[in-house]
Curated annotation (Swiss-Prot):
Name of the protein this chain belongs to: Uncharacterized methyltransferase BcerKBAB4_4222
Pfam families on file: Methyltransf_25
Organism the protein comes from: Bacillus mycoides (strain KBAB4) (Bacillus weihenstephanensis)
Role noted for this protein: Could be a S-adenosyl-L-methionine-dependent methyltransferase.
Cystine crosslinks: none
Superkingdom, taxonomy of origin: Bacteria
Similarity section: Belongs to the methyltransferase superfamily. YrrT family.
Keywords, in A-Z order: Methyltransferase, S-adenosyl-L-methionine, Transferase
Length: 212
């Protein structure tokens, strides 16, 4: 993952929170049960947490309130600025992304929401292999993101978006790297993880992978 999405992130920073609240009809279903999704990720995490894609700090805040020690990584300067306004003054956010980041001393859980799709499947594999080296046995990866059960589910979702006139959503689904569950299952298992997938709305699944 290079810097190709940073301009998009900076542009989206000031409207992101209205998106997650369902104010954009095209993305309302993508962010359905948003608070529950964040809570599920928090509940599945433990100990020292490395968070990729802090964004505007919504998940970060819940992790801190739950007593987790959080190391935040975010590539977008605008996102970091907004998050810092919402989070405790002493909390620092480091510039970086899923593949290039400063490694904390000790990590128990790696988390992310609505972001892993910025990586190609090959990059996802590289990232998970890297995380496998960072985590001890029992360590976890908990990612919530739009993924699809199979190719048919993806095709039907894209077609439904087009039929409803949701052309921005359809374009998003076709240009970003939304993957399939069998692909992610293979990536996790090949890198020493046991993984489960839990669907929380039509688009978003929570991937909970435990290092074996």
């Amino acid at each position: 993952m290079g810097t190709e999405f940073n301009g998009l992130f900076d542009e989206w920073a000031h409207t992101y929170d209205s998106f997650v609240q369902g104010e954009d009809i095209q993305y309302k279903e993508v962010f359905a049960h948003y608070e529950d999704i964040l809570e599920d990720v928090v509940n599945k995490s433990f100990g020292n947490v490395l968070e990729f894609g802090v964004g505007t700090g919504n998940l970060t805040n819940k992790l801190l309130l739950a007593g987790r020690t959080v190391y935040g990584i975010e590539p977008s300067r605008e996102m970091r600025t907004i998050a810092k306004e919402k989070l405790p003054k002493e909390f620092s956010i480091t510039e970086g992304d899923f593949l290039s980041f400063e490694v904390p001393n000790s990590i128990d859980t790696i988390v992310s929401t609505y972001a892993f799709h910025h990586l190609t499947d090959d990059e996802k594999d590289v990232a998970i292999a890297k995380y496998s080296q960072l985590l001890n046995k029992g360590g976890k990866i908990v990612f919530a993101d739009t993924i699809f059960a199979d190719q048919d589910a993806y095709d039907k979702t894209v077609e439904a978006a087009k039929q409803r006139g949701f052309h921005q959503l359809a374009n998003d689904l076709q240009t970003e790297y939304y993957t399939r569950i069998p692909i992610m299952q293979s990536i996790f298992e090949n890198n020493g993880f046991h993984v489960t997938f839990t669907r929380l709305n039509h688009f978003v699944w929570v991937m909970e992978a435990t290092k074996q």
